[in-house]
Amino acid sequence: MTTSHMNGHVTEESDNEVKNVDLASPEEHQKHREMAVDCPGDLGTRMMPVRRSAQLERIRQQQEDMRRRREEEGKKQELDLNSSMRLKKLAQIPPKTGIDNPIFDTEEGIVLESPHYAVKILEVEDLFSSLKHIQHTLVDSQSQEDISLLLQLVQNKDFQNAFKIHNAVTVHMNKASPPFPLISNAQDLAQEVQTVLKPVHHKEGQELTALLSAPHVQALLLAHDKVAEQEMQLEPFTDERVYESIGQYGGETVKIVRIEKARDIPLGATVRNEMDSVIISRIVKGGAAEKSGLLHEGDEVLEINGIEIRGKDVNEVFDLLSDMHGTLTFVLIPSQQIKPPPAKETVIHVKAHFDYDPSDDPYVPCRELGLSFQKGDILHIISQEDPNWWQAYREGDEDNQPLAGLVPGKSFQQQREAMKQTIEEDKEPEKSGKLWCAKKNKKKRKKVLYNANKNDDYDNEEILTYEEMSLYHQPANRKRPIILIGPQNCGQNELRQRLMNKEKDRFASAVPHTTRSRRDHEVAGRDYHFVSRQAFEADIAAGKFIEHGEFEKNLYGTSIDSVRQVINSGKICLLSLRTQSLKTLRNSDLKPYIIFIAPPSQERLRALLAKEGKNPKPEELREIIEKTREMEQNNGHYFDTAIVNSDLDKAYQELLRLINKLDTEPQWVPSSWLR
């Protein structure tokens, strides 16, 4: 069968199915496995009225027949009424005269009547009431039986639903057609009228001249002509041409998708080749194809504007569409895949723990739609329908990025990174028997790691991909602890001490624990928490310490409870920790804000240390830079932000700004913290 979807209407013909869709399109780049079928156009996408000459002619003919019928009925009624004695007496009364206003005179031959007539819509209740009334007027048993059957039918739920559909279609079919401009040169016509009225001196002519020359009216006529010109330039779409073309496809079910192609609005669809067919491969979120809901993955493209597509590769399709603009008509074979209606997907926010560049990825299905991002970026995942390739927006780019981009799915990224590590380990040289054994065990573990679905011991944290995030605004009375991380001689201790000295009422340090004896000038609970070695070791076993160590046979450490005491006091806890402590801290309920203090360039670092009276050797500077890279690579996923300390005063101001921002703006934190 043939079904045509035009401007929301559905009409049915025979043999083949046809659907018309209004969509739009963006720019195209290079072919990979899929290609985005987008190309530039002159106008923005908009819904255009479909005007079919044959239909319009039939409507005009029906209107003319109805007008003649009404005239004949009117004449008949007039003859009947004229024979009335009462009307003859009324005719003797002289008629009232009024003022003849030529403005409202119509030209000869023009009949002002609406092409659509009001259709009364009956409700089920009206039908039921009418049947009950008829039932009371009928007396024979056969009629009563027939009415009873009809009443049962009217009360049937399926009938009532069908009746509602009938009413809805009736209302829709009787809506007036969109207006079509009579002329596109209203400005010229107004100028001509003003020229004709120049020699005229009577009041009405002067008033009309002033009206037509008013700036607002001139602007209105200009706007009218611009819109009318676009409307009248559209070539009326002829269904006959399309029906002739689809006849060659025999009994195959086809559909027509109508698109108004634009230069700057993306279509959001990709195509691929299957043998000699061109198949819609992917519908991208945010595009006109996805919003219309009428273009589907798996549809085969047969024709575009009467040009046969079968046998062309995706590059030829791109070249073809590049030269087309305006209204495009696609003839498609619908996909045979039966898919459940897509559920409304919840947007998931994730933090990326790796860098991604689609131009360097041989696996991305459509390189033009690949979304690049850097470690630490927030991504808004809006579709996981394809588990290997998610559709996402990058934080801050939603307004500038009309189409969602493709990013690797979590499992897919983990598996290929595991395989990549396995291949790299296979290439490592074997140096000694002992190293060979260690390498062999590691390699074996990684190979098991690759099969993530079958490995119960699989550690997701070992291969970092994404971390689900949520927005969190810290309460005024419960501040997040500030953690400063960085290699030695990068200034984190100096920055921490400056904050403590300048704003003592706002910042505080956690009181550490120790097993050494208290000295005379020390106060328990202020300088240290003095505990026995046995108690200290028990707390270590219980995981109560963020970090701990041994110095001169005495244990020292910072506990989670010590940090919590500062938070409960309403102050901001300042800590300078080693990277080994970050995992324990992040797994606690303290919600830390971790700032990485990074060194500047090697030359700038030498100058800064020289100001402090230090004269480091070149190898020491290289070691600091290398340590920085190592910390970023191994622990960068824990960092909330970073400060490059090229000047201590500027670094201090930036640190203070970031801390103050926690009070005014919500921050992205792991979703697990808020559960």
Curated annotation (Swiss-Prot):
Residues 1-345 are annotated as: Required for the correct localization of PALS1 and PATJ at cell-cell contacts and the normal formation of tight junctions and adherens junctions. The modification Phosphoserine is found at S14, S25, S83, S84. One of its GO terms (biological process) is protein localization to plasma membrane. Residues 479-660 form the Guanylate kinase-like domain. SUPFAM superfamilies: L27 domain, P-loop containing nucleoside triphosphate hydrolases, PDZ domain-like, SH3-domain. Residues 1-78 are annotated as: Disordered. It holds the Pfam family PDZ. The L27 domain 1 functions in targeting to the tight junctions by binding to and stabilizing PATJ. Plays a role in tight junction biogenesis and in the establishment of cell polarity in epithelial cells. Also involved in adherens junction biogenesis by ensuring correct localization of the exocyst complex protein EXOC4/SEC8 which allows trafficking of adherens junction structural component CDH1 to the cell surface. Plays a role through its interaction with CDH5 in vascular lumen formation and endothelial membrane polarity. Required during embryonic and postnatal retinal development. This is Protein PALS1. The lineage of its organism: Eukaryota, Metazoa, Chordata, Craniata, Vertebrata.
